[in-house]
């Protein structure tokens, strides 16, 4: 059974990245009978930030953890299992201060676990979350996929770097950009993103 992990992170009620990502996940599901969508609304249901208790607990084998430490890593363990079980991951975020939403960053902090999603070797770190396809839906008021503002887009390079570190390199970004350039530009950007979603679904 195929698993699609859907991660939405925008806190905005009028978010554009969220409905496009949801539509993509649902279309992929409809194209693959028997598949399931596991959704994490990271804005509506914020994850716990890592703290001293958490960082100490993950450095111990499970059997050596105290009851309090076990509770501290419970959510992280669930998130790691969801990530490893997923065949496809759909991520939505707005470009906030040139990067991803903090809610999505917290998810990353919870799933980047040595021994679970990556490991250290004598020749360097090796990602363990391999064999997955990722789609990133990125919304922004300006244009950051190309042109003079492209160097300010830290979201896509960061996601490619950190997901690559975990062993995930097959990543496509669906830009919904130029939304602040007026209604006509916004409509054009939304239509282009929806068209790409349809193309992806038909090819699935």
UniProtKB/Swiss-Prot annotation:
Enzyme class: oxidoreductase
Subunit structure: Homodimer.
Gene3D superfamilies in the cross-refs: 3.40.50.360
Chain positions recorded as FMN binding sites: 10, 15-17
Pfam families xrefs: Flavodoxin_2
Keyword NAD: yes
Keywords: Flavoprotein, FMN, NAD, Oxidoreductase
Role noted for this protein: Quinone reductase that provides resistance to thiol-specific stress caused by electrophilic quinones. Also exhibits azoreductase activity. Catalyzes the reductive cleavage of the azo bond in aromatic azo compounds to the corresponding amines.
EC number: 1.6.5.-, 1.7.1.17
Cofactor note text: Binds 1 FMN per subunit.
Superkingdom of the organism of origin: Bacteria
Protein name, as recorded: FMN-dependent NADH:quinone oxidoreductase
InterPro entries given in the database record: Flavodoxin_fold, Flavoprotein-like_sf, FMN-dep_NADH:Q_OxRdtase_AzoR1, NADH:quinone_OxRdtase_FMN_depd
Annotated organism of origin: Rhizobium johnstonii (strain DSM 114642 / LMG 32736 / 3841) (Rhizobium leguminosarum bv. viciae)
Catalysis performed (reactions): 2 a quinone + NADH + H(+) = 2 a 1,4-benzosemiquinone + NAD(+); N,N-dimethyl-1,4-phenylenediamine + anthranilate + 2 NAD(+) = 2-(4-dimethylaminophenyl)diazenylbenzoate + 2 NADH + 2 H(+)
Molecular function terms from GO: electron transfer activity; FMN binding; oxidoreductase activity, acting on NAD(P)H as acceptor; oxidoreductase activity, acting on NAD(P)H, quinone or similar compound as acceptor
Similarity field: Belongs to the azoreductase type 1 family.
Cofactor: FMN
């Amino acid at each position: 059974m195929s698993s699609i992990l859907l991660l939405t992170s925008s806190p905005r009620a009028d978010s554009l990245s969220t409905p496009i990502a949801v539509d993509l996940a649902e279309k992929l599901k409809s194209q693959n009978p028997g598949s399931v969508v596991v959704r994490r609304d990271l804005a509506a249901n914020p994850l716990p930030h890592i703290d001293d208790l958490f960082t100490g607990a993950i450095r111990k084998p499970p059997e050596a953890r105290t009851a309090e430490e076990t509770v501290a890593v419970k959510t992280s363990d669930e998130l790691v299992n969801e990530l490893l079980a997923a065949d496809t991951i759909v991520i939505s975020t707005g470009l906030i201060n040139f990067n991803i939403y903090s809610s999505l960053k917290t998810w990353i902090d919870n799933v980047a676990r040595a021994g679970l999603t990556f490991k250290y070797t004598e020749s360097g770190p090796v990602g363990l979350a391999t064999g997955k396809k990722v789609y990133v839906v990125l919304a922004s008021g300006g244009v950051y996929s190309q042109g003079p503002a492209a160097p300010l887009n830290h979201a896509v390079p960061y996601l490619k770097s950190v997901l690559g570190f975990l062993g995930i390199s097959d990543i496509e970004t669906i830009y919904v950009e130029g939304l602040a350039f007026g209604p006509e530009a916004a409509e054009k950007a939304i239509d282009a993103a929806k068209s790409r979603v349809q193309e992806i679904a038909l090819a699935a």
